[in-house]
Amino acid sequence: FRSFDVALRTGKPQDSSLIGRMIGHCPRYMLASPDYLVRRGSLTHPRQLVEHRSITHRAWSEWLLRSESEDYRYLPDNAHMTDNLVYARECAIAGAGITLLPAFLVEDKVEKGALVQVLPEWNVEGNDLWLAYPSRKLNSPALMSYIEFAMQFDEVKRYYVGK
């Protein structure tokens, strides 16, 4: 365990020696390139994901989708796995399959038409962004000032909407 002052992380810290403050929530989207969907066909229901190639981040081995009337859980079984979201995005742009990505990584790619949303009527489980820091009694005033600053940082809040 290395010493640190503060960290940004997705998901609530599980370590009881850490204090966590949620900054906000970032939506994720299911996306593919227009070329991929022309070649492989569009989807009308998440059940059809088994007929498609998935590009999956190791931390998101389960895709939880929700429509107005139904919840659906998809477990990609023969997915192209990665631990790099930028790589997953670039694979999707290149037509390698369907992926889930956070809003901050895809906004410009969707605007330019490099990626399109798959099953837009279905919501994908998003991510919470947390500020984590040790629960030491004597955290420095500089650290506490930084934490207060980070909690107000508008560029982060542009993608992570408070709950």
Where are these regions (language model features)?
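Acidic, Gly/Pro-rich loop/turn segments at junctions of secondary structure
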Residues: 1-82
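Short beta-strand->loop
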Residues: 20-23, 77, 112-124
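Alpha-helical segments flanking ligand/cofactor-binding loops in enzyme cores
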Residues: 21, 47, 89-90, 144
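Alpha-helix/helix-capping structural signal
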Residues: 34-35, 86, 104-105
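C-terminal effector-binding regulatory domain of bacterial HTH transcription factors
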Residues: 103-108, 112, 122-163
